Structure formats: C-alpha cells, structure tokens
Amino acid sequence: MKVIVVKNQLEGGKIGLDLLKESINNGAKTLGLATGSTPVEFYNQIVNSDLDFTNMVSVNLDEYVGLDGSNEQSYRYFMTKHLFGEKPFKENFLPNGKATDLEAEAKHYDQIIEENPIDWQILGIGQNGHIGFNEPGTPAEITTHVVDLQESTIKANARFFESEADVPRKAISMGLASIMKSKNIVLMAYGKEKAEAIKGMVEGEVTTELPASILQNHANVTVIADEAAVSLLSK
C-alpha cells in the first residue's frame, strides 16, 4: 500500500488525475467511481482536463435505496452534476435504488461488474472505516448487497440533507469482494476525522471491524491523504 501525502484536496485531485491518466494510457476501459465530498476536487480536475471517456464505462460503488436519479440527494444526480454532465461516458452504471426487488437488483449489479471488470477504482473512507457502504462487520467475501446504514454513517451524511430524518436508512453497495476485484485502487482521505480509520487501514490488523483494512491484501492500492489524515501513522 503506497501512501502519498498532499497539502490539500487540490493537490490530491491533481495527483489522482495523473494516476488516472497513467492507467488509461495503460489500457484502462472501466472506471469504478465514488461519491461524497472527498472526490469532488478530483472530478473537477477531470472535467477541466482533456480526457475523453466516450469509449469508456463507469461503475459506481453504491446508491441510496428509495431515491431515483432526479433526486438531488441521489448518487446518480451527484455524478451527473460533478462528472457525467461534462464528461460523457459510453455507459454509466449505478445501482437502481428504486428497484422493486432489491435483492434481484444486487445480483444484476454483480453481473454488470462481471461483464465490466473495473480497471481503476476510486474510494473514500468513512470515519468508521467503511468503503462504499460496507459497514463494520461486513463479511470480506460479500458482493453487491442491500445495506442497513449505521447511525454514524447516517449522521455523517446528514449534512447533505435538510435533516437527519431525511437520510435514507438503506443503500445498495458493491461488496468488499467486488471492490477487491478492481485491478488498481486509489483511496483518498482528507481531515483529522479520518486519521483513526487511516491508521487502522494502513497499520492495523485486517479485520471486518474496519472494512478498509482488507485493502492490505490488494496488490495495487495507492492512498492520497493530507497531513491531518495521516497524522496518526507511525511511519
């Protein structure tokens, strides 16, 4: 696991863009994408770049249950606003949070990932160590699944909604096994509130109690983090 320490999100976004360009030059065709505040500057860098995604496919990590793509809090809306609206892809895949049969939708999404192996995956990390919506206790072998969101995740995401009560309680998420199939993974983390999770992920033991720690078992992981996020690392 390679750790790159940056001054701020702007520098992190630029380094992320360089890594993405390198991967595309090496033949990457499918990008795994994440949402939330962490990758926004990275997406800004992409939008202002000369990259062309019209022959590429994107696969997003997750989506809230109950929100359709026109809802401003849905992850499809987020992706359209920050990336897809400016940089069209050949195809964009996100879980369908309005599916009538959520378990069938999860299986369908596994099939999409099988047909579109992810070459380059961007990740954030939650304060509790979640990646995607894989909360503490999630089995390592799980693929796409329906998740009951933990209170800490609901509280962390409440800032994007009018009130905490409006935050969906469920999501569909790629599983840890799905994420681990990605050829290359770049995880971004900013701020001191991520420091405990980063320490556990990089230096702790691999445990389901800190889902991101499974990334220690992946051959190609790069962490882009600011000084605050790496402040608890011993080396």
Swiss-Prot record:
GO terms for biological process: carbohydrate metabolic process; glucosamine catabolic process; N-acetylglucosamine catabolic process; N-acetylneuraminate catabolic process. Pathway: Amino-sugar metabolism; N-acetylneuraminate degradation; D-fructose 6-phosphate from N-acetylneuraminate: step 5/5. InterPro entries: Glc/Gal-6P_isomerase, Glucosamine6P_isomerase, Glucosamine6P_isomerase_CS, NagB/RpiA_transferase-like. One of its GO terms (molecular function) is identical protein binding. Its EC number is 3.5.99.6. It is an enzyme of class 3 (hydrolase). It comes from the Bacteria. One of its GO terms (cellular component) is cytoplasm. CDD domains: GlcN6P_deaminase. It catalyses: alpha-D-glucosamine 6-phosphate + H2O = beta-D-fructose 6-phosphate + NH4(+). Keywords: Carbohydrate metabolism, Hydrolase. The active site is at D62, N128, H130, E135. Catalyzes the reversible isomerization-deamination of glucosamine 6-phosphate (GlcN6P) to form fructose 6-phosphate (Fru6P) and ammonium ion. Belongs to the glucosamine/galactosamine-6-phosphate isomerase family. NagB subfamily. This is Glucosamine-6-phosphate deaminase. The lineage of its organism: Bacteria, Bacillati, Bacillota, Bacilli, Lactobacillales.
